[in-house]
Each structure stands twice: as C-alpha cells, then as structure tokens.
Amino acid sequence: MGKPTGFLEYERKDGPVTVPKERIKNFKEFHGQLPEEEQRLQGARCMECGVPFCQAGTMIAGMASGCPLHNLVPEVNDLVWHGNWEQAYVRLSKTHCFPEFTSRVCPALCEAACTCGLHAKPVSTKENERAVIEYAYANGLVKGEEPKVRTGKKVAVIGSGPAGLSAAWNLNKRGHSVTVYERHDRVGGLLRYGIPNMKLDKSIIDRRIEVMKAAGIKFICNADVGKDISGKELEKEYDRVILCGGASHPRDIHVPGRDAKGIWFAVDFLGTVTKQLLDTNFEKVPYELAKGKNVLVIGGGDTGNDCVGTSIRLGAASVTQLEMMPKAPECRAASNPWPEWPKVLKTDYGQEEAIDVFGHDPRLYQTTVTEFKKKKDGTVCSAVLVSLEPKKDEKTGRLSMVPIEGTQKEIPVDLVLIAAGFLGSEGYVAESFGVKLNARTNVETVNGSYRTGKEKILTAGDMHRGQSLVVWAIAEGREAAKEVDKSLMGYTYE
C-alpha cells in the first residue's frame, strides 16, 4: 500500500449533500463529489489490513459481509490514492461492469466490513468507486466496442434490470449475440422505475445503455415475454435464454377496507411518478398524486423510505411510516459483532427530510394497520393502527410480532403506499417457458446453480434468489453469464 498510515493521518470526509429543505424542491440527485485531490486522501485511508473483509462477500448469519462482486477494494483504493484513475478503473472493471449504479444505490456492504471501521469511520469506498467511474466516463475510458470475434451463438435476456444488464454485458464481451427484452417502455427495470430519480438519475442509466448498444447489444422494449411473445418462440430462436424478470410480485396486506381507492403498491406509485417526469422531461411534476394529502407508508425498508422522500417532494401534508419491527439500537449489540452487517438504526434521506419538514421522525415502530375506512365515494379516509409486541411460539421457538389489545388508534389517511416487500417473480413468465417456481415463488434451479430444469433456460437476479440488492443482481447476472458461456463453448473465463 502506498500510504500505510493514511487511516491515522486523514479523517473520513464525504462529498457535499444538499440540505433537505433545498433538495425536496426537485427530483435531482443531491449527493455531490469531493474535489479530486480530497478524494485521493480518502483512498489513502485504506489500511494495509491482513484480511480485507471488504472484498470477501462472505455470508455470515444469513447476511453478506463485504462485496458480493468481490471487487478488489484495497487495490482500487490504493490506485485512487496514487491518482492513477485509469488503472483504478481497469482494476474495478475486472469484477464490476456497472459501478455507476452501485456507487449511488448500494448500502455499501464493503464499508460495513471495513477493518478501519472497527475503531474509526470506515474507508469511503462507495464514494471512491463513484469518483473512479465518473473519471472514466469524463475521460473516454468507458467504451462501447464490439467484440473482435463473434461466436455465432444467440442469447436472449428477459428483463433489463441490473441482473439482465449484467448478464447481457458479460455475454456480449465473450462474443455471443445478445438481445434484451423489456416489458416497459424504457430499459432499466428496477433501476428505471423502482428507484426514484433523486437517488439514481435516469441519465446515468441512459449513458450506460448507449455504451451497451455501441458494443452490439440489442434492446427490445414494450415486449412482455409470456404475453406479447411466447417462451416457445424464443426457445426456438435463441441458443440460450436467461430469465432476469426480477421479484416483481408485491406483497399485499389483507385487512378490511383494502379495496378503497387511494391505496397503491409502492412500486406502482414510484414508477408512475418517474414515468411522468421522464415523459415530460421533468417539466410536469405529478403533484396531484400526493399534494395536501396525509400519506401512510407501510414498510420500513428502502422502498418505504423512497416513498417518504417522493411524497414530500409531491407536497404531502403529512407522512407516517409504519415499521412492524422494534426500533434498532444506536450501536452494535454484542450478538452482532463485526464484520457482520451492523443491525443498527439507520435514518435515511427520506426520514431526514420528513424530520426537517414536519419536525419529527415519520416512523412508528412495532405498528401495523388493521383496517382502512372509506368515504362514501370509496376513497380511503383513515387507517386503524395497532401496536405490536414480540411473542415467542412455545412449539417452534420462533418470535413473531403480535397485536397488543387496547392499543388501536385511528389516523386520517388520504393516500396509502404499501412497501411490504415482494413475494417473488411473475408466474406467467416461468409458465411460458415451462419452468417451475419453488415454494418461495422464485424460479427453481438445479443444485443451487443458475440452470433450470430445461437445458436452454437459466435464471439470475431476484427472479432466482428473491428480493435482494442491486449489487447481488449484478453479481448473479455475471455468474449466470459464465454458466451460459460454459454451456455453449465448453469453457469460460473466470
């Protein structure tokens, strides 16, 4: 390492962030970058630690510790420190095809496993990664070049989310001819319509897609495979098909009044907002969806937080966010040691904005809804909430959250956004290809591989593993591409 004592000499410094009262005025990204020289010093903070857990991607207690892509984090950080941005990009590209996405939306599993984070703040690897890829784009290093030799093999990728794009990029590099099918009007899947623009500017996706097109990858939009096009057709036309349709089936809540008007699945709400912004070049903001309304967000995860931030930008009168689980501790518990993922309280951008705008945290912990009430016209007007407590099942030993009698309360509600996670993939896609779904409604695979029961059909991403992170989807797309390559050519490059 070029600066073994860098972690002692330099404090962590993050890029500038626009204050909540300013950033809620628009849907623009609000995380800036440090000047180049200051970013270099952040690379210098990477220690010469004996075991770099940051790049391990090891599963501990059911959660990933370190990067699932196995990015060579210490090497990239060292090259950043030396100001060798071109080689930093080359090194990062060996494992990662889309750093511009993860450097914006990843929870930074690498930083959670950083050795420096044991006694100080971890190395800002996520921001270093963003600096590297933005330098690469600005200096013409990211090129869409067609492979010199084509194999003559054709592969269809169903879905253009992070897993599908990753699979397509890696297969194309090996010389296979790749066509990506997307059911929506624009490429990007979850990246396009599941993540708000202020978190991932859609021009970032467009920039990458242009590179992929220049490299010879074809994209067909408004093509809902399983409905518009049959799986059998594609099986005949292509040598291999990879199903990367995501876990797009949202989990519902079944309570009285669920049929009231004004109750949305979060993914539909976020997608509607983004589509209208894109269709009008950000000139028309769909304020009518939430302006002046009391918004109830059900779910305390990332999507729920995105709903909070989006509702505030649309002029909501109030926002309440329900979280079934107890409030996480401020610091790690003894039962959650490093390098496990830290189960600690996180206040994300949406909650920060709610605190700034409304003067309080929008989250109600250990709370769920038991009923929605309607006006005469069928529109939702209130929600009945109840407090929960953990209770252990004596037979199984499992803890579950159960209602506490006498804790019901009613709050006014005009808009409900259900962000309770996803159950799995849409069944009609798998059915069209004649492949099975498992008990979790993910596509069933052979011996934990990416292969289904049919030789030509593989799967990757959330459609394979269930709802997960963008970084996992990219990793799965890459590994599934290797499996396809090996099945077609008899070998692949590791």
Regions found by a protein language model. Give the residues of each.
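Glycine-rich Rossmann-fold phosphate-binding loop(s) that bind the pyrophosphate
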Residues: 158-162, 299-301, 462
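Beta1-alpha1 glycine-rich phosphate/pyrophosphate-binding loop at the start
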Residues: 5-32, 41-44, 57, 68-82, ...
